[in-house]
């Protein structure tokens, strides 16, 4: 088997694994009524999704660093096996508490599947080829977003909600087999140090922070006792983040090497990624609310109205992958930022009488901007460092993105009049959403500014090649 065929097999395995991890974030949503109907525990509804995302976020930087130390293949297989074990156990869960714990296990494995594939692509392909392949890989997230609720609904209607977890097993096993038999790595034999104090302090800090954000977003966060718990969690989070930073500065193999942030490309890419993901989560969560609460349309219609974004995002990812080696990082970033600014201004001026064609245009531009910008930044981060730091670099960028989404949905949630869309007066809801979209437009201006200051990626890659 020649090298090109081997590389194709590895790439297929990575695409499959990425799709499985991505779709698990959305496929459960349509199955939740059936799950709560059988297992009861409606009050724990939100934790089925939240615990998966929380576990994934916490383990992302850990897998990134361990893949630099022990190899991509080893850590990918370990993560995939944990993910499949969590999937199988979720399928046999008999109580809501069991399902929550098994979803947490699934998320612990998903941290590897959302990070290491991008790192392996960075290892296998040259800069020009890498951009195209990562563009296709980024489009998988958009495809998963579209197909997740659809697949979930079909499996629940025709088989069982348990099938949404069992379906991961055959595809996951194929991905593990293809990668384990095709990927070859030459690791330098040396004593390796695992930063256990860093892992522990980071895990505690992130768990407390994300749990506090979850309480703030949910109705559980109302009341004096809940407010006290939120303050306590945030205080613990700050203390352990400070401890984590001190440990990392002294560690010979830090989980998040601070030297990464001295690299201007990575520093600017992380700032841009954070802002983009704050905006991204607002668009995804609050546009459907506008459709239901202001336009007075049913939930099904709001899902259909988001299709332009779901189509434009993969399209933007593919275009970014094909253009970045020709046009450059700054060109793609600025183009994406301009589309985002135009769409966010459009959203901030919408009314109940805004024609559907304009709403579709704004939504399409938003999706195109996310595809162009986020994909080009992924390519930039994986290309800006050498092999021994690539896992940590990609993982840190993924972590920054999730942090942006978490903070975005929490802060903008506080600006919104709480309640369900059918119980809020359309004029009141429109006013709250206009405030949110106004601040999204302001943030979009900062995205444009950061994009204009983005370094030239080709020069950095060439310098890296010369150094090696």
Where are these regions (language model features)?
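12-transmembrane solute porter fold
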Residues: 10-23, 28-30, 49, 81, ...
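Hydrophobic transmembrane-helix bundles of small-molecule transporters
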Residues: 157-272, 297, 441
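Extracellular/periplasmic helix-loop-helix junction of adjacent transmembrane segments
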Residues: 31-58, 300-304
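Central cavity-lining transmembrane alpha-helices of secondary-active solute carriers
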Residues: 50-64, 114-118, 307-320
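Intrinsic disorder in cytosolic terminal tails and internal cytosolic loops
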Residues: 1-6, 454-468
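MFS transmembrane alpha-helix packing/gate-lining sites
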Residues: 24, 52-59, 109, 140-144, ...
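Helix-loop-helix hairpins in multi-pass membrane proteins, especially solute transporters
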Residues: 60-197, 387
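Interfacial helix-cap and linker-helix signal at transmembrane-aqueous boundaries
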Residues: 35-36, 66-67, 151-159, 213, ...
């Amino acid at each position: 088997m020649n090298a090109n065929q081997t590389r194709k097999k590895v790439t297929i395995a990575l695409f499959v694994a990425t799709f499985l991890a991505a779709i698990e974030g959305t496929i459960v949503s349509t199955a939740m009524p059936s799950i709560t109907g059988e297992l009861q525990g409606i009050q724990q509804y939100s934790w089925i999704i939240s615990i998966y995302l929380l576990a994934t976020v916490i383990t992302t930087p850990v897998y990134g660093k361990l893949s630099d130390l022990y190899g991509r293949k080893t850590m990918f297989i370990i993560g995939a096996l944990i993910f499949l074990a969590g999937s199988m156990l979720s399928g046999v869960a008999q109580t809501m508490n069991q399902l929550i714990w098994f979803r947490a296990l699934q998320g612990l494995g998903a941290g590897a599947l959302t990070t290491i594939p991008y790192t392996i692509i960075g290892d296998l392909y040259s800069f020009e080829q890498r951009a195209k392949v990562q563009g296709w890989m980024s489009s998988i997230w958009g495809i998963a977003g579209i197909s997740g609720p659809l697949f979930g609904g079909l499996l629940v209607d025709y088989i069982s909600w348990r099938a949404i977890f069992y379906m991961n097993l055959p595809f996951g096993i194929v991905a593990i087999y293809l990668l384990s038999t095709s990927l070859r790595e030459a690791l330098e034999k040396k004593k390796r140090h695992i930063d256990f104090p860093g892992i522990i302090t980071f895990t505690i800090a992130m768990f407390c922070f994300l749990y506090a954000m979850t309480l703030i977003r949910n109705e559980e966060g109302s009341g004096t006792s809940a407010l006290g718990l939120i303050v306590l969690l945030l205080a613990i989070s700050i203390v352990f983040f400070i401890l984590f930073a001190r440990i990392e500065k002294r560690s010979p193999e830090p989980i998040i090497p601070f030297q990464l942030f001295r690299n201007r490309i990575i520093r600017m890419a992380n700032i841009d990624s954070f802002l983009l993901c704050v905006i991204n989560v607002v668009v995804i969560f609050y546009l459907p609310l506008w459709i239901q609460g202001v336009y007075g349309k049913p939930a099904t219609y709001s899902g259909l109205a988001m299709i332009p974004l779901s189509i434009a995002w993969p399209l933007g990812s593919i275009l970014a992958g094909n253009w970045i080696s020709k046009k450059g990082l700054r060109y793609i970033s600025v183009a994406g930022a301009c589309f985002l600014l135009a769409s966010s201004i459009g959203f901030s001026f919408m009314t109940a009488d805004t024609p559907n064609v304009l709403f579709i245009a704004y939504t399409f531009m938003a999706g195109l901007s996310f595809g162009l910008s986020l994909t080009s930044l992924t390519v930039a981060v994986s290309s800006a460092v050498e092999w021994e730091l690539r896992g940590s670099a990609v993982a840190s960028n993924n972590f920054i993105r999730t942090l942006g989404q978490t903070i975005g949905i929490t802060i903008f949630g506080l600006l919104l009049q709480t309640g369900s869309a059918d119980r809020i007066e359309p004029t009141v809801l429109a006013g709250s959403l206009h405030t949110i979209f106004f601040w999204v437009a302001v943030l979009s201006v900062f995205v444009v500014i950061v994009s204009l200051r983005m370094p030239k990626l080709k020069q950095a890659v060439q310098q890296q090649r010369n150094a090696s």
